[in-house]
Regions:
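Alpha-helix C-terminal capping segments
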Residues: 1, 157-159, 184-185
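N-terminal capping/lid subdomain adjacent to the active-site entrance of alpha/beta enzymes
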Residues: 1-63, 67-76, 80-84, 204-219
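Conserved beta-strand termini and adjacent loop/short-helix elements that scaffold enzyme active sites
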Residues: 14, 117, 168, 194-195
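Catalytic core of soluble alpha/beta enzymes
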Residues: 41, 46-171
Length: 219
């Protein structure tokens, strides 16, 4: 569906929230040792982000997903405190997530790249988000927006407005497979999220398991 631009995609290690700088540093190191070259944290503290950057070194892209914890004022304060750690993006820093005008102001005032969209359910919401200038990276979730057709509408909307698509995909089953195939059809594919945890088994065996931080898109 949509054709296949490539069958090799870049993945990133998406860590849980640990709220422990030493544990964050350890998980970052083990992710890098396993071949991932991009790391996402789920932290809301400066100490944890600092520990991740120290563990990763200066050249590894690091993102921080905060899951909508802050007011606009708090988000600006934290964005400035996190700026020295050179984040690729700051994800969902403001509650409520549909406060696109505040996200746009934060993005403009802080100069920090903003990612959002996992809580948006239609192309109409993404249109408003992008129109407001709220995001550098748009993050539709194929399981939340209603499937492949709506995802493709959002993809086209993002491309038309110069916004990079970075799908939200912390899944293990059909949603993850759909994300892989949709991303493979993108002219400018984003990175694909891999929840970094020990699995008893993978639903599809080794077919979707990243090797050295990359996926081979299954047929």
């Amino acid at each position: 569906l949509g054709g296949c631009v490539r069958d090799d995609l870049v993945g990133y290690s998406s860590l849980f929230k640990y709220a422990d700088p030493d544990l964050v540093a350890s998980k970052v190191k083990s992710s890098l040792d396993e071949g991932f070259g991009i790391i996402k944290l789920h932290e809301t503290g400066v100490a944890e982000v600092a520990a991740a950057r120290k563990s990763a070194g200066p050249n590894v892209p690091i993102m921080v997903d905060t899951n909508c914890p802050w007011t606009p004022t708090e988000a600006y304060d934290m964005a400035m405190k996190l700026k020295p750690y050179d984040l690729l993006w700051l994800e969902e820093p403001i509650f409520p997530p549909e406060d696109f005008s505040s996200l746009a102001k934060l993005r403009a005032d802080s100069g920090v790249a903003i990612a959002a969209g996992e809580n948006a359910c239609t192309a109409f919401q993404f249109r408003e988000m992008i129109k407001a200038g709220a995001v550098t990276y748009a993050q539709p979730s194929v399981t939340k927006v209603g499937g492949i057709t709506e995802f493709r509408k959002i993809s086209a909307l993002a491309a038309l407005n110069g916004v990079q698509l970075m799908p939200h995909s912390p899944y293990f089953g059909p949603g993850f497979l759909a994300t892989l195939h949709l991303t493979a059809a993108e002219a400018n594919p984003g990175y694909v999220e891999w929840f970094y945890l020990d699995r008893e088994a993978c639903l599809y065996g080794d077919a979707i398991k990243p090797v050295n931080g990359r996926y081979t898109v299954p047929n």
